[in-house]
Amino acid sequence: MISSFEVRKATIDDYFELRNLICDVTRCTETLSREQAEERFRYNTYHPYCLVDTENGRIVGYAGFYIIPHLGRKNDSRIEHVIISKEYRNRGLGRLLCKQIIEDAKNKFNCGRIDLTVESHIAKKLYSSLEFEKVNTEVMRNSFLDLTPKSD
């Protein structure tokens, strides 16, 4: 039941719970100290969202939303890492999380578009239903990170 969930901006106090969720689906190569995490949470272009099960207070979803200022039109933006805990999937919660971000992008952050990269066919169906369209672009990356996980 969607009514028992809340989408809100994540805070520094959510960092370690969010990190565990993020590391379930993507490579995490470092654990930030609280001070390092606080610095990232202060970036004015980074807006982390979380989805909370209000019955138990547990964070069950995350999405990173980034604003990219543009000098000639409304801001561009990007959604990264829409993640829902495995046991909470297939309940419409990814949709709930994304709809809030889309609403905020339009009405709060003056964005003219949102981009995202998608690989999963399930996620493609979700994003298409939210009026995202495939554009013919190529992703190019210069990765200078060491993606070997560091032991804690």
Curated annotation (Swiss-Prot):
Pfam families: Acetyltransf_1 (PF00583). Keywords: Acyltransferase, Cytoplasm, Transferase. It is an enzyme of class 2 (transferase). The gene is SSAT. It comes from the Eukaryota. Its EC number is 2.3.1.57. Its main location: cytoplasm. The active site is at residue 127. GO terms for biological process: putrescine catabolic process; spermidine acetylation; spermine acetylation. The keyword Transferase applies. It comes from Cryptosporidium parvum (strain Iowa II). This is Diamine acetyltransferase. One of its GO terms (molecular function) is diamine N-acetyltransferase activity. InterPro entries: Acyl_CoA_acyltransferase, GNAT_dom, YpeA/RimI_acetyltransf. Enzyme which catalyzes the acetylation of polyamines. Displays higher substrate specificity for spermine than for spermidine. May function to acetylate host-derived polyamines, thus alleviating the necessity for de novo synthesis of these molecules. It catalyses: an alkane-alpha,omega-diamine + acetyl-CoA = an N-acetylalkane-alpha,omega-diamine + CoA + H(+).
